[in-house]
């Protein structure tokens, strides 16, 4: 089955994101596809751990594609390997984020900026944190990074909502 057919039937327009712009914090970065790998805790338990992009934002391959329903998840470093999400904590509700798939522009407005504990957090807290990168019934773009810059004890989660369907128009036609 083709990706197009799986995501919405024949004629559906779905493509991998390839660039993210956030004008308010001077971000204009490539987006690459990310997967995950098996990792082991100190006590020998095996778990899945997301890969993280270097010098780019990473699109989580089990998340939605731009123009399709669901949660589009991008992650990136805040203090190493390009520090592409270094300034996420400067975003405020109403700030714009633009996700590109080739020449197609998908505009979003920041709705929430959350900072949640991660290091030494309870299993329940970490499970609650992980819910932000799962699928939702509504359309959203979720950006995730470590926080703060000096010790990464928390996660910063930015949720942005589509501006409207006219802002996902082909850039050449605007």
Where are the regions a protein language model picked out?
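Solvent-exposed, non-transmembrane regions of membrane-associated and secreted proteins
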Residues: 1-174
